[in-house]
Amino acid sequence: MKPIPASEQISLVDRLSKACGGTYTAEQRRKYFITGPQWAGAYEGQALFHAPTRKPVTFEEVIRHYAEIGIGYWATHDTDVIPAGDLFTSKQDEIVGRIGDTLKANGLACSMVTTETFYHAVFSAGPAAESPYVRQYAAERLKNTVKIGHQLGAQFAVYWPGSFGYQIQGAVEETQALRWYADGLNAACEADIAIAAQHNRPTLKHCMEAKPFEPQAEILLPTSDAMLSFIASGLLTHPEMVGLNPEYLHELMWGAAPRAALARALTAGKLWHFDINDGYRLKHDVDIAVGLVNPLDWLNVLILLRSHGYNGPFNLDYKPPRTTSNWGVFAVSFPTAVDRFISLWEMAGEAIEDPIIREATDALKAGGVVSDPRDVNAITEAHKELLTLHELIGHRLFQILLGLHRGRTYSV
């Protein structure tokens, strides 16, 4: 093949993209509670070791593109759209008004707001630092985000304590820091109660998002399980208002099974929001789009969620690759991410109804015939052949993932 001129590259990518097929319409995509974050659509490709590869994108452009794709919901950090110096000013009110108008004009809803408490230099020691002035500022930021959330009609507020911890052990007294962090959440919840009453709206669902490491060396609430313990610790004045926003990749980063972490959140009644992406176990936070690394694991995750009635939100918290152009972000990256999720979601529905999996599962639950429930050898023998069904269920899920259950085969 000859080198492709720059003027012909978009048409080539577009032609090959259409040739892939399997796409859903914007109307079909809107049926799912999928949310598009401002930070993902506007990500320029920058990282600790990387310069940006894309041009800046405004929130107006991101929202318009999401509408065209069929992503029905939008989410943002406060400073994704409002410069830190303009917070708490009339400029903030003007920007929030523009956002509201843009969402309305494009038929989108704001589903979630979150506060940046990790990037600005004021948070160099974290949002629960020793200085009462830093903690007061952090609390004001959280309360301000709650206010913005109600102004935009959001349902959720997310908290990511990525800078809550320490670089140097011994410099921070952990139990005190946990109490200070709880004070910030308590301030946000109290403000929410008051602001919701003013707007005649329900209070927001406040969702904590865990991450085992990065950017802080040691994060004090590194896992979803740690956050469940924190919520139940007695430090929160309104624990009923606080739940979880697990992120798929954050669970993989510390070697966990995301499905098991989600199961524990479901059991606690605290799975309220879910950040979806993909990546590699025990690696850093690469934020690859859903289904590109672990599609079988994702199928199993969605089987669990569908089985327990969790239907969203599903927040596309990923970074379009640095190799993808500004055009490609919205022409290829986001549409294909949404379509992979929908396909996996519908596959999960098929798996739940699959007669082979259902009969195998029922048989395992029924167990074998045992005459003496205290005879360990008899119990072992009674289930010896039946337990082979575990592997067969795994094989059947593989067949569903590849469409083999519908008769697809390969000629060899």
Model-found features: residue ranges?
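An active-site-proximal structural segment forming one wall of the substrate-binding cleft
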Residues: 102, 130-156, 176-199
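Basic- and aromatic-lined ligand-binding clefts that recognize polyanionic substrates
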Residues: 198-231
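Conserved beta-strand positions in the central sheet of alpha/beta enzyme cores
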Residues: 72-75, 112, 158, 275, ...
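Surface-exposed, active-site-proximal loop segments in enzymatic domains
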Residues: 45-49, 80-94, 118-136, 163-176, ...
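Histidine-acidic metal/acid-base catalytic patches
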Residues: 1-70, 170, 183-194, 219-412
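Glycine-rich, aromatic-flanked loop segments that form ligand/cofactor-binding clefts
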Residues: 19-41, 64-69, 78, 83-86, ...
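Extended hydrophobic secondary-structure segments that form protein cores and membrane-embedded regions
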Residues: 158, 205-210, 243-249
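Substrate-binding cleft and catalytic face of glycoside hydrolase catalytic domains
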Residues: 103-127, 157-168, 202, 212-213, ...
